[in-house]
Amino acid sequence: MSRNGNFIDKTFSVVANILLQIIPTTSGEKEAFTYYRDGMSAQSEGNYAEALQNYYEAMRLEIDPYDRSYILYNIGLIHTSNGEHTKALEYYFRALERNPFLPQAFNNMAVICHYRGEQAIRQGDSEIAEAWFDQAAEYWKQALTLTPGNYIEAHNWLKITGRFE
């Protein structure tokens, strides 16, 4: 699996370098993309601190809202991996403000809300749990609206819990 992952990472890097050379872009855009590419590489290797540094530099240089949305989304992924769910939600939300067509951000927000609902149940607070589950349902519905047929487990959960309309 890691060999295949490394092959994909190397392929991405080669393609990215070719694109940087042939697509007309400003030097700032090229520099931003270079930081983004380096951030993705570090993230795929589990070097989250290095990835964040690269993403923050890319954010400083990148002006296109669509491109910024993917940088913000990846920052959210890192915070999710680190268990920093509040920060992750903030970054996913900021990504969606710039690009409302990121079903993966809606899905990840739903997963975090669902997890928090399960935590609330374990703590004996069913009212708080229901609020988290309702929020998870809203995010999953948005993800499913954007990509019908994806997120099958979420779709089934929505049906089973009576949250699917």
Curated annotation (Swiss-Prot):
One GO BP annotation of this record: photosystem I assembly
Superkingdom of origin: Eukaryota
Topological category with respect to the lipid bilayer: Peripheral membrane protein
Database matches in SUPFAM superfamilies: TPR-like
Gene Ontology CC terms: chloroplast thylakoid membrane
InterPro entries tied to this protein: PSI_Ycf3_assembly (IPR022818), TPR-like_helical_dom_sf (IPR011990), TPR_rpt (IPR019734), Ycf3/AcsC/BcsC/TPR_MFPF (IPR051685)
Subcellular location: Plastid, Chloroplast thylakoid membrane
Protein name: Photosystem I assembly protein Ycf3
Organism: Spinacia oleracea
Name of the gene this protein is made from: ycf3
